[in-house]
From Swiss-Prot:
Pfam families: NQRA_2nd (PF24836), NQRA_N (PF05896), NQRA_SLBB (PF11973). Belongs to the NqrA family. It catalyses: a ubiquinone + n Na(+)(in) + NADH + H(+) = a ubiquinol + n Na(+)(out) + NAD(+). The gene is nqrA. GO terms for biological process: sodium ion transport. Its EC number is 7.2.1.1. One of its GO terms (molecular function) is oxidoreductase activity, acting on NAD(P)H, quinone or similar compound as acceptor. This is Na(+)-translocating NADH-quinone reductase subunit A.
Amino acid sequence: MITIKKGLDLPIAGKPAQVIHSGNAVNQVAILGEEYVGMRPSMKVREGDVVKKGQVLFEDKKNPGVIFTAPASGTITAINRGEKRVLQSVVINVEGDEKITFAKYSTEQLNTLSSEQVKQNLIESGLWTALRTRPFSKVPSIESEASSLFVNAMDTNPLAADPSVVLKEYSQDFTNGLTVLSRLFPSKPLHLCKAGDSNIPTTDLENLQIHDFTGVHPAGLVGTHIHFIDPVGIQKTVWHINYQDVIAVGKLFTTGELYSERVISLAGPQVKEPRLVRTIIGVNLSQLTQNELSAGKNRVISGSVLCGQIAKDSHDYLGRYALQVSVIAEGNEKEFFGWIMPQANKYSVTRTVLGHFSKKLFNFTTSENGGERAMVPIGSYERVMPLDILPTLLLRDLIVGDTDGAQELGCLELDEEDLALCSFVCPGKYEYGSILRQVLDKIEKEG
Protein backbone atom coordinates (compact mmCIF):
# COMPACT_ATOMS: atom_id res chain seq x y z
CA MET A 1 0.00 0.00 0.00
CA ILE A 2 1.20 3.50 -0.87
CA THR A 3 0.38 6.16 1.73
CA ILE A 4 0.14 9.81 0.70
CA LYS A 5 0.93 12.15 3.59
CA LYS A 6 1.45 15.46 1.80
CA GLY A 7 -1.71 17.01 0.39
CA LEU A 8 -4.99 18.45 1.60
CA ASP A 9 -8.52 17.21 2.17
CA LEU A 10 -10.50 20.41 1.65
CA PRO A 11 -12.95 20.94 4.56
CA ILE A 12 -15.84 22.05 2.35
CA ALA A 13 -19.50 21.84 3.33
CA GLY A 14 -22.13 20.07 1.26
CA LYS A 15 -20.68 16.57 1.10
CA PRO A 16 -22.94 14.17 -0.80
CA ALA A 17 -24.93 11.35 0.73
CA GLN A 18 -23.43 8.21 -0.82
CA VAL A 19 -26.75 6.89 -2.11
CA ILE A 20 -27.68 6.88 -5.81
CA HIS A 21 -30.84 8.78 -6.82
CA SER A 22 -32.40 9.59 -10.18
CA GLY A 23 -31.47 13.05 -11.44
CA ASN A 24 -33.82 15.63 -12.94
CA ALA A 25 -35.32 14.76 -16.31
CA VAL A 26 -33.32 16.47 -19.07
CA ASN A 27 -33.81 16.90 -22.80
CA GLN A 28 -30.46 18.33 -23.88
CA VAL A 29 -26.91 16.97 -23.99
CA ALA A 30 -23.69 18.12 -25.64
CA ILE A 31 -20.13 17.16 -26.46
CA LEU A 32 -17.62 19.81 -25.34
CA GLY A 33 -14.87 20.21 -27.93
CA GLU A 34 -12.38 22.07 -25.75
CA GLU A 35 -12.10 19.11 -23.36
CA TYR A 36 -10.01 17.26 -25.92
CA VAL A 37 -6.51 18.70 -25.90
CA GLY A 38 -5.25 19.66 -29.37
CA MET A 39 -8.33 18.31 -31.16
CA ARG A 40 -9.40 19.88 -34.48
CA PRO A 41 -12.79 18.59 -35.64
CA SER A 42 -13.88 17.55 -39.10
CA MET A 43 -17.66 17.83 -38.76
CA LYS A 44 -19.86 15.00 -40.05
CA VAL A 45 -23.18 16.64 -39.06
CA ARG A 46 -24.77 20.06 -39.24
CA GLU A 47 -27.45 21.92 -37.31
CA GLY A 48 -30.88 20.38 -37.86
CA ASP A 49 -29.60 16.85 -38.51
CA VAL A 50 -31.28 13.99 -36.67
CA VAL A 51 -28.73 11.61 -35.15
CA LYS A 52 -28.83 8.22 -33.49
CA LYS A 53 -27.07 7.35 -30.26
CA GLY A 54 -23.56 6.23 -31.23
CA GLN A 55 -23.58 8.07 -34.59
CA VAL A 56 -20.42 9.90 -35.63
CA LEU A 57 -20.57 13.66 -34.99
CA PHE A 58 -17.01 14.61 -35.93
CA GLU A 59 -13.51 13.24 -36.43
CA ASP A 60 -10.20 14.62 -35.21
CA LYS A 61 -8.19 16.02 -38.15
CA LYS A 62 -4.98 15.88 -36.11
CA ASN A 63 -5.63 12.33 -34.98
CA PRO A 64 -7.12 10.52 -38.00
CA GLY A 65 -9.48 7.69 -37.16
CA VAL A 66 -10.48 9.05 -33.75
CA ILE A 67 -14.21 9.73 -33.92
CA PHE A 68 -16.64 11.33 -31.49
CA THR A 69 -20.14 9.89 -31.27
CA ALA A 70 -23.52 11.08 -30.00
CA PRO A 71 -24.27 10.19 -26.35
CA ALA A 72 -28.01 10.23 -27.11
CA SER A 73 -30.38 10.27 -30.07
CA GLY A 74 -32.06 13.50 -31.16
CA THR A 75 -31.65 16.65 -33.22
CA ILE A 76 -28.51 18.78 -33.52
CA THR A 77 -29.72 22.18 -32.32
CA ALA A 78 -26.43 24.07 -32.10
CA ILE A 79 -22.77 23.82 -33.07
CA ASN A 80 -21.11 26.49 -30.93
CA ARG A 81 -17.74 27.92 -31.87
CA GLY A 82 -15.48 30.43 -30.16
CA GLU A 83 -12.50 32.51 -31.24
CA LYS A 84 -10.68 31.21 -34.31
CA ARG A 85 -13.64 28.88 -34.84
CA VAL A 86 -12.61 26.63 -31.96
CA LEU A 87 -15.36 24.07 -31.38
CA GLN A 88 -17.02 24.72 -28.02
CA SER A 89 -19.98 22.34 -28.05
CA VAL A 90 -22.24 20.24 -30.24
CA VAL A 91 -25.72 20.36 -28.67
CA ILE A 92 -28.36 17.64 -29.11
CA ASN A 93 -32.03 17.90 -28.14
CA VAL A 94 -32.77 14.40 -26.89
CA GLU A 95 -35.59 12.69 -28.79
CA GLY A 96 -36.44 9.02 -29.25
CA ASP A 97 -34.28 6.01 -28.53
CA GLU A 98 -32.70 5.13 -31.88
CA LYS A 99 -29.19 3.77 -31.62
CA ILE A 100 -26.38 2.30 -33.65
CA THR A 101 -25.21 -1.15 -32.58
CA PHE A 102 -21.69 -2.52 -32.52
CA ALA A 103 -20.02 -5.91 -32.20
CA LYS A 104 -20.95 -7.83 -29.06
CA TYR A 105 -19.57 -10.91 -27.36
CA SER A 106 -20.47 -13.34 -24.63
CA THR A 107 -18.72 -13.04 -21.27
CA GLU A 108 -16.75 -16.19 -22.05
CA GLN A 109 -15.44 -14.70 -25.31
CA LEU A 110 -14.04 -11.53 -23.74
CA ASN A 111 -10.83 -13.16 -22.56
CA THR A 112 -10.12 -14.47 -26.07
CA LEU A 113 -10.48 -11.18 -27.95
CA SER A 114 -7.58 -9.97 -30.05
CA SER A 115 -6.08 -6.53 -29.59
CA GLU A 116 -7.47 -5.50 -33.00
CA GLN A 117 -11.02 -6.58 -32.08
CA VAL A 118 -10.88 -4.52 -28.90
CA LYS A 119 -9.40 -1.51 -30.65
CA GLN A 120 -11.91 -1.62 -33.52
CA ASN A 121 -14.96 -1.72 -31.26
CA LEU A 122 -13.66 1.08 -29.05
CA ILE A 123 -12.89 3.28 -32.06
CA GLU A 124 -16.16 2.66 -33.92
CA SER A 125 -18.29 3.33 -30.83
CA GLY A 126 -16.41 6.48 -29.87
CA LEU A 127 -15.32 4.96 -26.54
CA TRP A 128 -11.70 5.27 -27.66
CA THR A 129 -11.98 8.89 -26.48
CA ALA A 130 -12.35 7.62 -22.89
CA LEU A 131 -8.62 6.84 -23.01
CA ARG A 132 -6.07 9.58 -22.36
CA THR A 133 -2.30 9.70 -22.51
CA ARG A 134 0.23 10.88 -20.01
CA PRO A 135 2.16 13.01 -20.82
CA PHE A 136 -0.02 15.67 -22.52
CA SER A 137 -3.46 14.21 -21.54
CA LYS A 138 -4.60 13.70 -25.13
CA VAL A 139 -6.77 11.04 -26.73
CA PRO A 140 -4.18 8.52 -27.99
CA SER A 141 -3.51 7.92 -31.65
CA ILE A 142 -5.11 4.71 -32.90
CA GLU A 143 -1.70 3.58 -34.20
CA SER A 144 0.13 4.12 -30.91
CA GLU A 145 0.81 1.85 -27.95
CA ALA A 146 1.28 2.50 -24.27
CA SER A 147 3.87 1.29 -21.78
CA SER A 148 0.96 0.39 -19.49
CA LEU A 149 -2.71 1.17 -18.90
CA PHE A 150 -4.06 2.64 -15.65
CA VAL A 151 -7.61 2.22 -14.35
CA ASN A 152 -8.45 4.73 -11.63
CA ALA A 153 -11.04 3.28 -9.24
CA MET A 154 -10.69 5.85 -6.46
CA ASP A 155 -11.51 9.53 -6.07
CA THR A 156 -10.24 11.87 -3.35
CA ASN A 157 -11.48 15.09 -4.95
CA PRO A 158 -13.56 17.29 -2.62
CA LEU A 159 -17.26 16.25 -2.65
CA ALA A 160 -16.60 13.23 -4.89
CA ALA A 161 -18.69 10.09 -5.22
CA ASP A 162 -17.37 6.93 -3.59
CA PRO A 163 -16.45 4.57 -6.47
CA SER A 164 -17.27 1.48 -4.38
CA VAL A 165 -20.91 2.66 -4.09
CA VAL A 166 -21.19 2.96 -7.88
CA LEU A 167 -19.30 -0.24 -8.63
CA LYS A 168 -21.44 -2.26 -6.23
CA GLU A 169 -24.29 -1.82 -8.72
CA TYR A 170 -22.17 -2.48 -11.83
CA SER A 171 -19.66 -5.05 -10.59
CA GLN A 172 -20.11 -7.49 -13.50
CA ASP A 173 -19.86 -4.74 -16.13
CA PHE A 174 -16.72 -3.41 -14.43
CA THR A 175 -14.97 -6.78 -14.38
CA ASN A 176 -16.02 -7.36 -17.99
CA GLY A 177 -14.49 -3.99 -18.86
CA LEU A 178 -11.25 -4.93 -17.09
CA THR A 179 -11.13 -8.16 -19.08
CA VAL A 180 -11.59 -6.29 -22.37
CA LEU A 181 -8.93 -3.70 -21.52
CA SER A 182 -6.49 -6.44 -20.53
CA ARG A 183 -6.75 -7.69 -24.12
CA LEU A 184 -5.85 -4.28 -25.61
CA PHE A 185 -2.16 -4.85 -24.77
CA PRO A 186 -1.96 -8.45 -23.48
CA SER A 187 1.78 -8.21 -22.82
CA LYS A 188 1.61 -4.85 -20.99
CA PRO A 189 0.54 -4.27 -17.37
CA LEU A 190 -3.03 -3.21 -16.56
CA HIS A 191 -2.80 -1.24 -13.29
CA LEU A 192 -5.97 -1.05 -11.17
CA CYS A 193 -5.59 1.65 -8.52
CA LYS A 194 -8.02 1.75 -5.61
CA ALA A 195 -8.38 3.02 -2.05
CA GLY A 196 -6.89 0.67 0.51
CA ASP A 197 -10.14 0.26 2.45
CA SER A 198 -12.49 0.04 -0.56
CA ASN A 199 -14.40 -2.95 -1.84
CA ILE A 200 -13.69 -2.81 -5.57
CA PRO A 201 -14.64 -5.82 -7.74
CA THR A 202 -11.69 -7.45 -9.49
CA THR A 203 -11.08 -10.48 -11.66
CA ASP A 204 -8.22 -12.90 -12.23
CA LEU A 205 -6.28 -11.63 -15.24
CA GLU A 206 -2.70 -12.43 -16.21
CA ASN A 207 -1.57 -8.83 -16.67
CA LEU A 208 -3.75 -7.17 -13.99
CA GLN A 209 -1.84 -5.53 -11.15
CA ILE A 210 -3.77 -4.11 -8.19
CA HIS A 211 -2.40 -1.17 -6.19
CA ASP A 212 -3.78 0.27 -2.94
CA PHE A 213 -3.44 3.96 -2.13
CA THR A 214 -4.42 5.73 1.06
CA GLY A 215 -4.05 9.22 2.53
CA VAL A 216 -5.10 12.75 1.70
CA HIS A 217 -5.90 14.25 -1.68
CA PRO A 218 -4.27 13.90 -4.26
CA ALA A 219 -4.00 10.20 -3.33
CA GLY A 220 -6.86 9.51 -5.74
CA LEU A 221 -5.48 11.29 -8.81
CA VAL A 222 -4.18 9.19 -11.67
CA GLY A 223 -1.11 11.43 -11.90
CA THR A 224 -0.16 10.35 -8.38
CA HIS A 225 -0.65 6.69 -9.29
CA ILE A 226 1.44 6.97 -12.46
CA HIS A 227 4.25 8.77 -10.61
CA PHE A 228 4.65 6.01 -8.04
CA ILE A 229 4.03 3.00 -10.30
CA ASP A 230 5.19 3.70 -13.86
CA PRO A 231 6.57 7.25 -14.32
CA VAL A 232 6.42 8.75 -17.81
CA GLY A 233 8.76 10.92 -19.86
CA ILE A 234 9.20 12.38 -23.32
CA GLN A 235 9.98 8.89 -24.71
CA LYS A 236 7.54 6.94 -22.54
CA THR A 237 3.73 7.10 -22.56
CA VAL A 238 1.05 5.46 -20.45
CA TRP A 239 -2.71 5.60 -20.91
CA HIS A 240 -5.43 5.91 -18.31
CA ILE A 241 -9.21 5.57 -17.99
CA ASN A 242 -11.68 6.16 -15.14
CA TYR A 243 -13.77 3.44 -13.53
CA GLN A 244 -17.11 4.55 -14.99
CA ASP A 245 -15.72 4.36 -18.51
CA VAL A 246 -14.54 0.82 -17.70
CA ILE A 247 -18.20 0.04 -16.92
CA ALA A 248 -19.13 1.51 -20.31
CA VAL A 249 -16.51 -0.66 -22.02
CA GLY A 250 -17.92 -3.76 -20.34
CA LYS A 251 -21.45 -2.91 -21.41
CA LEU A 252 -20.40 -2.09 -24.99
CA PHE A 253 -18.75 -5.46 -25.54
CA THR A 254 -21.56 -7.53 -23.96
CA THR A 255 -24.60 -5.61 -25.30
CA GLY A 256 -23.27 -4.07 -28.51
CA GLU A 257 -24.65 -0.67 -27.47
CA LEU A 258 -22.95 2.55 -26.43
CA TYR A 259 -23.51 3.15 -22.72
CA SER A 260 -23.54 6.85 -21.82
CA GLU A 261 -24.99 6.84 -18.30
CA ARG A 262 -23.08 8.48 -15.47
CA VAL A 263 -23.46 8.39 -11.71
CA ILE A 264 -22.16 11.72 -10.49
CA SER A 265 -21.93 13.64 -7.25
CA LEU A 266 -24.16 16.73 -7.13
CA ALA A 267 -22.79 18.53 -4.11
CA GLY A 268 -21.40 21.67 -2.55
CA PRO A 269 -22.43 24.36 -0.05
CA GLN A 270 -25.14 25.69 -2.37
CA VAL A 271 -26.83 22.35 -3.13
CA LYS A 272 -29.99 21.75 -1.09
CA GLU A 273 -29.70 17.96 -1.01
CA PRO A 274 -26.14 16.86 -1.85
CA ARG A 275 -26.25 13.30 -3.19
CA LEU A 276 -25.29 10.98 -6.02
CA VAL A 277 -27.49 11.23 -9.11
CA ARG A 278 -27.86 9.09 -12.19
CA THR A 279 -27.66 11.02 -15.46
CA ILE A 280 -25.84 10.87 -18.83
CA ILE A 281 -22.62 12.20 -20.29
CA GLY A 282 -22.87 15.78 -21.54
CA VAL A 283 -26.12 16.55 -19.70
CA ASN A 284 -27.33 20.16 -19.60
CA LEU A 285 -26.38 21.30 -16.10
CA SER A 286 -28.98 24.07 -15.90
CA GLN A 287 -31.63 21.39 -16.34
CA LEU A 288 -29.92 18.93 -13.99
CA THR A 289 -29.61 21.52 -11.18
CA GLN A 290 -33.06 23.08 -11.60
CA ASN A 291 -34.70 23.54 -8.15
CA GLU A 292 -31.65 21.91 -6.56
CA LEU A 293 -29.72 25.05 -5.53
CA SER A 294 -29.98 27.61 -2.75
CA ALA A 295 -31.04 31.15 -3.67
CA GLY A 296 -28.44 33.67 -4.76
CA LYS A 297 -25.67 33.84 -7.34
CA ASN A 298 -24.11 30.41 -7.70
CA ARG A 299 -21.25 29.01 -9.71
CA VAL A 300 -21.94 25.59 -11.20
CA ILE A 301 -18.77 23.64 -11.92
CA SER A 302 -18.42 20.57 -14.11
CA GLY A 303 -15.91 18.63 -12.06
CA SER A 304 -14.10 19.35 -8.82
CA VAL A 305 -14.12 22.73 -7.08
CA LEU A 306 -10.33 22.59 -7.34
CA CYS A 307 -9.94 22.07 -11.08
CA GLY A 308 -13.36 21.83 -12.75
CA GLN A 309 -14.76 23.97 -15.57
CA ILE A 310 -17.33 26.73 -15.13
CA ALA A 311 -20.63 25.58 -16.63
CA LYS A 312 -22.40 28.40 -18.42
CA ASP A 313 -23.54 29.48 -21.88
CA SER A 314 -22.15 27.12 -24.55
CA HIS A 315 -20.23 25.19 -21.86
CA ASP A 316 -23.27 24.53 -19.65
CA TYR A 317 -22.85 20.76 -19.85
CA LEU A 318 -21.28 17.87 -17.95
CA GLY A 319 -17.78 17.20 -19.21
CA ARG A 320 -16.74 13.91 -20.80
CA TYR A 321 -14.37 13.10 -17.96
CA ALA A 322 -16.28 14.77 -15.09
CA LEU A 323 -17.70 12.57 -12.35
CA GLN A 324 -19.13 15.36 -10.22
CA VAL A 325 -20.96 18.68 -10.34
CA SER A 326 -19.92 21.14 -7.64
CA VAL A 327 -21.82 24.30 -6.72
CA ILE A 328 -20.48 27.19 -4.63
CA ALA A 329 -21.61 30.78 -4.14
CA GLU A 330 -20.16 33.62 -6.18
CA GLY A 331 -17.96 35.48 -3.71
CA ASN A 332 -17.80 38.95 -5.22
CA GLU A 333 -18.89 40.95 -2.17
CA LYS A 334 -16.41 43.22 -0.41
CA GLU A 335 -15.72 42.92 3.31
CA PHE A 336 -15.14 45.88 5.61
CA PHE A 337 -11.65 45.56 7.11
CA GLY A 338 -11.63 41.95 5.96
CA TRP A 339 -7.84 41.83 6.02
CA ILE A 340 -7.64 42.65 9.73
CA MET A 341 -10.57 40.65 11.14
CA PRO A 342 -10.05 37.33 12.99
CA GLN A 343 -12.11 35.50 10.32
CA ALA A 344 -13.39 32.54 12.35
CA ASN A 345 -15.58 31.50 9.41
CA LYS A 346 -12.77 31.34 6.86
CA TYR A 347 -10.26 28.61 6.18
CA SER A 348 -6.53 29.09 5.63
CA VAL A 349 -3.69 26.64 5.13
CA THR A 350 -1.19 29.21 6.45
CA ARG A 351 -2.90 29.69 9.84
CA THR A 352 -3.52 33.38 9.17
CA VAL A 353 -7.17 33.24 10.31
CA LEU A 354 -8.91 31.69 13.30
CA GLY A 355 -10.88 29.37 11.03
CA HIS A 356 -7.74 27.30 10.48
CA PHE A 357 -8.01 25.95 14.02
CA SER A 358 -11.66 24.95 13.65
CA LYS A 359 -12.69 21.39 12.83
CA LYS A 360 -15.87 22.46 11.05
CA LEU A 361 -16.70 22.42 7.34
CA PHE A 362 -16.66 25.74 5.50
CA ASN A 363 -19.01 27.30 2.96
CA PHE A 364 -16.33 28.13 0.42
CA THR A 365 -17.12 30.71 -2.27
CA THR A 366 -15.35 31.79 -5.46
CA SER A 367 -13.58 34.65 -3.67
CA GLU A 368 -9.79 34.49 -3.94
CA ASN A 369 -9.38 36.86 -0.95
CA GLY A 370 -6.85 39.02 -2.73
CA GLY A 371 -5.44 39.92 -6.11
CA GLU A 372 -2.52 38.61 -8.16
CA ARG A 373 0.93 39.35 -6.82
CA ALA A 374 4.43 37.92 -7.02
CA MET A 375 5.00 34.24 -6.34
CA VAL A 376 5.90 33.87 -2.66
CA PRO A 377 7.84 30.70 -1.69
CA ILE A 378 6.78 30.14 1.92
CA GLY A 379 6.55 26.34 1.86
CA SER A 380 2.86 26.12 0.94
CA TYR A 381 3.49 24.15 -2.25
CA GLU A 382 5.68 21.59 -0.50
CA ARG A 383 2.91 20.85 2.03
CA VAL A 384 0.46 19.77 -0.68
CA MET A 385 2.78 18.15 -3.25
CA PRO A 386 3.38 14.43 -2.54
CA LEU A 387 5.25 13.71 -5.78
CA ASP A 388 9.02 13.46 -5.83
CA ILE A 389 9.53 16.85 -7.47
CA LEU A 390 10.60 20.31 -6.31
CA PRO A 391 7.34 22.24 -6.62
CA THR A 392 8.57 25.79 -6.00
CA LEU A 393 11.31 25.50 -8.62
CA LEU A 394 8.97 23.78 -11.08
CA LEU A 395 6.23 26.38 -10.67
CA ARG A 396 8.75 29.18 -11.14
CA ASP A 397 9.94 27.64 -14.42
CA LEU A 398 6.34 27.22 -15.57
CA ILE A 399 5.56 30.88 -14.88
CA VAL A 400 8.55 32.14 -16.88
CA GLY A 401 8.01 29.58 -19.66
CA ASP A 402 11.32 27.73 -19.22
CA THR A 403 10.39 24.49 -20.99
CA ASP A 404 13.81 22.86 -20.54
CA GLY A 405 13.87 23.51 -16.82
CA ALA A 406 10.25 22.45 -16.42
CA GLN A 407 10.94 19.13 -18.18
CA GLU A 408 13.93 18.43 -15.97
CA LEU A 409 11.78 19.10 -12.91
CA GLY A 410 9.02 16.71 -13.98
CA CYS A 411 6.29 18.72 -15.72
CA LEU A 412 5.64 15.93 -18.24
CA GLU A 413 4.21 13.78 -15.45
CA LEU A 414 1.57 16.39 -14.63
CA ASP A 415 -1.88 17.44 -15.75
CA GLU A 416 -3.88 20.50 -14.68
CA GLU A 417 -5.53 18.59 -11.83
CA ASP A 418 -2.14 17.67 -10.34
CA LEU A 419 -1.37 21.35 -9.71
CA ALA A 420 -4.85 22.31 -8.47
CA LEU A 421 -3.81 22.23 -4.81
CA CYS A 422 -0.77 24.38 -5.60
CA SER A 423 -3.14 26.95 -7.12
CA PHE A 424 -5.41 26.73 -4.07
CA VAL A 425 -2.63 27.43 -1.55
CA CYS A 426 -0.73 29.94 -3.72
CA PRO A 427 -0.28 33.32 -1.97
CA GLY A 428 0.20 34.90 -5.41
CA LYS A 429 -3.18 33.65 -6.75
CA TYR A 430 -1.64 31.96 -9.80
CA GLU A 431 -3.64 29.43 -11.81
CA TYR A 432 -0.92 26.87 -12.37
CA GLY A 433 -3.12 24.48 -14.35
CA SER A 434 -3.52 26.81 -17.32
CA ILE A 435 0.15 27.82 -17.12
CA LEU A 436 1.16 24.15 -17.20
CA ARG A 437 -1.02 23.54 -20.25
CA GLN A 438 0.69 26.38 -22.16
CA VAL A 439 4.10 24.91 -21.36
CA LEU A 440 3.04 21.36 -22.31
CA ASP A 441 1.65 22.61 -25.62
CA LYS A 442 4.92 24.39 -26.32
CA ILE A 443 6.99 21.29 -25.46
CA GLU A 444 4.86 19.10 -27.74
CA LYS A 445 5.04 21.60 -30.58
CA GLU A 446 8.79 22.18 -30.38
CA GLY A 447 9.69 18.56 -29.61
